[in-house]
Amino acid sequence: MIKSSVGGNEGKSKFFDQEKRLERTWNNSNWGKQGIISPVDGDMKIIDIELEKKMTKLEHENKLMKNALYELSRMENNDYAAWVIKVLFGEVAHGAK
């Protein structure tokens, strides 16, 4: 984990570690660009690896954005960040009214 002596950077190292973990998931793949045959709804279907990678990356970026908004709303007591969380995710931010 990256440590920083400057205040306020603690959250950045946590997000960086999550991105490295995502990269390792796909770099260890034995399948390359081939599809994987997998049961989906009882039928055998070919799953496109490239599409799965893109979808996983989008889901991961969404999760990082959501975590960053939660941290911003919590640490800065930012009403705008709390409003964005409520509109996008339908949830109330931690500590928000």
UniProtKB/Swiss-Prot annotation:
Assigned GO CC terms: host cell membrane; membrane
Keyword check for Cell inner membrane: no
Task: From the UniProt record, list the coiled-coil ranges.
Answer: 49-78
Concerning InterPro entries, the annotation shows: Phage_phi-29_Gp1
Provide any one GO MF term from the record.
RNA binding
On the tree of life, the source organism's domain of life is Viruses
Cellular localisation: Host membrane
Transmembrane intervals: none
> A Gene Ontology biological process annotation?
DNA replication
- State if Lipid biosynthesis is listed as a keyword: no
Q: How does it sit in the membrane?
A: Peripheral membrane protein
Keywords from UniProt, A to Z, are: Coiled coil, DNA replication, Early protein, Host membrane, Membrane, RNA-binding, Viral DNA replication
Domain comment in the entry = The hydrophobic C-terminus is involved in the association with the host membrane. The coiled coil region is involved assembly into protofilament sheet structures.
User: What does this chain do?
Assistant: Protein that assembles into highly ordered structures and provides a specific site for viral DNA replication. Probably anchors the viral DNA replisome to the host membrane.
What is the similarity comment for this entry? Belongs to the phi29likevirus DNA replication protein 1 family.
Quaternary structure per UniProt? Homomultimer. Self-associates into large complexes forming long filamentous structures. Interacts (via N-terminus) with the primer terminal protein.
The protein, known as: DNA replication protein 1
Whose protein is this, by species?
A: Bacillus phage PZA (Bacteriophage PZA)
Q: What is the lineage of its organism?
A: Viruses, Duplodnaviria, Heunggongvirae, Uroviricota, Caudoviricetes
Q: Which gene encodes it?
A: 1C
